[in-house]
């Protein structure tokens, strides 16, 4: 816990102490102290509505209660400069900001660990995200899901959760048969032979590339093989090619996975039959009209769902239930799925299945990733100018750069539609948020280099009484808010909270830089203290950028 968090806790305790001293309530009656940061600086550093919360207990008007709390409050212990009462009884606290300088050495000593909290207390969470069919390139929705999912995992880990990142490989469905048939067509074409493309075949450039590679490596060997043997080989070859490409693309996008889980393994290991039997034993499965049904309405779904069709084939739902049962059998406390907007209607039946298996409500959470629209020169862009086809993740990275893609996708709430401005993403101006943040980091590194050239190294054991300007205190307050931003992002599953924080920190840094002189040759002690403040800012900004997968350049 850093000094800013400690002082906030002290302030809460002193508010309780003032309530007791004023005789407004017994200790057991005092509600949790809520502290908010006012939007306007003129309203103080913190504000509480404790007076309104106590009105019924104390049987007094909130404003009178607020006056009694203020009169009984010990300002010294909580480093309070002054207090005032606003509106019906809000109490505003103005801090004596000198305590903030204690934050500098604590950040310097914590280094890459600064921002870590333990709100997760080691809870085991599995996050499954991307999970695109291995039949083509990753599109914009996949890219946004990858960026959001990875940032969420990083934030959860920083907040003390035990996180596992998983990619579910859809390698057992009809789409893989179609992949094999499509590869076969392109293989024959590469040999100058004709074969009709299936109506629902895959026509991407990658399939053409697979066909050409097969022709180069094996010649016409497969033309003369039995179709079943040829299909089996093309299925395996095509799947491996596409998976290798997916892994490579995601690795280049700075999105690692701990587990790549094959759907086929559910069939091979008997997991599907086990899941069906588990539901049957609990009385949630019945037979009707020749089909096997899951009684999902018991758990809030709008209708019961078919698990096995009349022809004996499984619906998508049964293997998915088996997969989620397997996740929980592996010992995870909570599951988070990051799904595309087209899966919205699928959520109630999956949550029903988890409950039907005997797990508590809320064990499965689903984060929905909404659609992305690209804009260039103010116009909506549907196709890539280079390929004439839908824009892929690779295309977007080539167009604006990896950092811009990661930052922009982590910048908005995932469940809102996103307009991605390509011109803004490549502009070198303060209007471009990723440039603004990275330039702040590079600017700090430049100042630290200048200090080193003059023999001025930042350290944790300096005299920080030189830090006393309003801009310095604003910067320190923002630095002190990083652990809280991480905690909120983790608890609410909103990684964009960190991106918002990055912008606030960059703004505070630029504002300080434009108002103050960091290195003063006439005052080396003050210069070293300010360079230490710069180092603390650099550590915080770097740690925050890492959480969303964006680099922190030392030069720009």
From Swiss-Prot:
One of its GO terms (molecular function) is arginine-tRNA ligase activity. The keyword Nuclease does not apply. GO terms for cellular component: cytoplasm. The keyword Aminoacyl-tRNA synthetase applies. A motif ('HIGH' region) lies at residues 132-142. InterPro entries: aa-tRNA-synth_I_CS, Arg-tRNA-ligase, Arg-tRNA-synth_N, Arg-tRNA-synth_N_sf, ArgRS_core, DALR_anticod-bd, Rossmann-like_a/b/a_fold, tRNAsynth_Ia_anticodon-bd. Keywords: Aminoacyl-tRNA synthetase, ATP-binding, Cytoplasm, Ligase, Nucleotide-binding, Protein biosynthesis. It catalyses: tRNA(Arg) + L-arginine + ATP = L-arginyl-tRNA(Arg) + AMP + diphosphate. SUPFAM superfamilies: Anticodon-binding domain of a subclass of class I aminoacyl-tRNA synthetases, Arginyl-tRNA synthetase (ArgRS), N-terminal 'additional' domain, Nucleotidylyl transferase. It is found in: Cytoplasm. One of its GO terms (biological process) is arginyl-tRNA aminoacylation. CDD domains: Anticodon_Ia_Arg (cd07956), ArgRS_core (cd00671). Monomer. Belongs to the class-I aminoacyl-tRNA synthetase family. This is Arginine--tRNA ligase.
């Amino acid at each position: 816990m850093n000094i800013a968090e400690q002082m906030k806790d002290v302030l809460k305790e002193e508010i309780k102490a003032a309530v007791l001293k004023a005789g407004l309530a017994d200790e057991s009656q005092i509600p949790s102290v809520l502290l908010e940061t006012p939007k306007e600086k003129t309203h103080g550093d913190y504000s509480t509505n404790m007076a309104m919360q106590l009105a019924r207990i104390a049987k007094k008007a909130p404003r009178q209660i607020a006056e009694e709390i203020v009169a009984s409050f010990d300002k010294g212990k909580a480093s309070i400069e002054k207090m005032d009462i606003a509106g019906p009884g809000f109490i505003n606290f103005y801090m004596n900001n000198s305590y903030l300088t204690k934050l500098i050495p604590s950040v310097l000593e914590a280094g890459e660990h600064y921002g870590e909290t333990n709100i997760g207390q080691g809870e085991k969470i599995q996050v499954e995200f991307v999970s695109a069919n291995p039949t083509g390139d990753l599109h914009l929705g996949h890219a946004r899901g990858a960026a959001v999912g990875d940032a969420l995992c990083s934030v959860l880990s920083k907040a003390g959760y035990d996180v596992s990142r998983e990619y579910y490989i859809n390698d057992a469905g009809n789409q893989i048969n179609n992949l094999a048939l499509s590869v076969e067509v392109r293989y024959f074409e590469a040999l100058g032979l004709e074969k009709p493309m299936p109506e629902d075949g895959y026509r991407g450039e990658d399939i053409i590339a697979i066909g050409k590679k097969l022709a180069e490596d094996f010649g016409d060997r497969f033309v003369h093989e039995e179709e079943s043997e040829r299909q089996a080989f093309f299925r395996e070859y095509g799947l491996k090619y596409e998976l290798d490409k997916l892994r490579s693309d995601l690795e280049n996008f700075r999105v690692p996975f701990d587990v790549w889980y094959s759907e086929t393994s559910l069939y091979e290991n008997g997991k599907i039959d086990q899941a069906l039997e588990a539901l049957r034993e609990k009385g949630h499965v019945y037979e009707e009209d020749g089909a096997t049904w899951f009684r999902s309405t018991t758990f809030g779904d709008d209708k019961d769902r078919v698990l096995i069709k009349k022809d004996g084939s499984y619906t998508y739902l049964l293997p998915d239930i088996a997969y989620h049962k397997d996740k929980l059998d592996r010992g995870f406390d909570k599951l988070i799925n990051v799904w595309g907007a087209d899966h919205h209607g699928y959520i109630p039946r999956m949550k029903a299945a988890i409950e039907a298996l005997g797990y508590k409500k809320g064990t499965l959470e689903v984060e929905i990733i909404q659609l992305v629209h690209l804009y260039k020169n103010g116009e909506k862009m549907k196709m890539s100018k280079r390929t004439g086809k839908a824009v892929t993740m690779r295309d977007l990275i080539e167009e604006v750069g990896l950092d811009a893609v990661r930052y922009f996708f982590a910048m908005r709430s995932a469940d809102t539609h996103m307009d991605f401005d390509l011109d803004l993403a490549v502009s070198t101006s303060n209007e471009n948020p990723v440039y603004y943040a990275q330039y702040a980091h590079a600017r700090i590194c430049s100042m630290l280099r200048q200090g080193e050239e003059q023999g001025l190294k930042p350290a944790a054991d300096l005299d920080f009484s030189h830090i006393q300007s309003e801009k310095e205190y604003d910067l320190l307050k923002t630095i002190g808010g990083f652990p809280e931003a991480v905690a909120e992002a983790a608890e609410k599953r909103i990684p964009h909270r960190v991106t918002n924080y990055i912008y606030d920190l960059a703004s505070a840094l630029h504002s300080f830089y434009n108002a103050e002189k960091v290195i003063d040759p006439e005052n080396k002690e003050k210069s070293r203290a300010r360079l230490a403040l710069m180092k603390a800012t650099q550590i915080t900004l770097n740690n925050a950028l890492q959480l969303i997968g964006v680099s922190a350049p030392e030069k720009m």
